[in-house]
Amino acid sequence: GSSESRPVIYEGSLKKFVEDPEHVLEEATHERALLIAASGGKDFRKDATIYGDLMEEKPGIKWGMSIDMNSCYGCGACVMACTAENNVSVVGKPEVLRAHDMHWLRIDRYFTGNINDPESIQTVFQPMLCQHCDNAPCENVCPVAATNHSSEGLNQMTYNRCIGTRYCANNCPFKVRRFNWADYTGSDSFKNNQDEMNDVVMMMNDDLTRMVLNPDVTVRARGVIEKCSFCVQRLQEGK
């Protein structure tokens, strides 16, 4: 498929890349040249910025994650592991149908090939999580600075400062921020908010079930945004 005559995903083989590293960039470079010409010779995607000196590299550790998309076949095991490790609420299908899904990590699926040749259609899987952008667009729109940047390059959430404006979720280009519409896990202070919830949600409010939660990760409450933390608790343990 395509959008505005552009392919959804660019692909190239390792063999071709070794032979000609610039080959995989040819199509994207050509499209950018057309955009630059149409905008009077200025490459806004490369040169324009509202950050100024903030774009300069800062010394120190910068955490990142490398994902081999050639190996990913969309099994979802990483999603389950993330959910278990970070106490991500299991909200049930009815909540997902209302666009209240809570995954910190999701698997995006893209279809590529010739639409006139069904046999050529292939599926490309892409795990999608918070990219911890160097100059994150979610950070400068929060009125209470609940989301901020650490000295090690992590985009952090301060849950007890969040007032639930959801401006950050609206400004996230990767759509990886999740809002707690209800007290899905552990809270019993909003009984009226639990009347029509799916049974699987109510199970997580049971005292015994709460014992499966990871004690190293904060349990989020109703009305706050949450997202991938790059498993900061494990990074700290590794130090």
Can you name each region flagged by the protein language model?
Residues 1-64, 70, 81-84:
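Long, contiguous, secondary-structure-rich segments that constitute the structural scaffold
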Residues 42-59, 99-141:
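Active-site-adjacent "gating/activation" loops or surface patches in catalytic cores
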Residues 73, 77-97, 106, 135-161, ...:
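Iron-sulfur cluster-binding cysteine motifs and their immediate structural context
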Residues 182-198:
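Internal, charge-rich low-complexity segments
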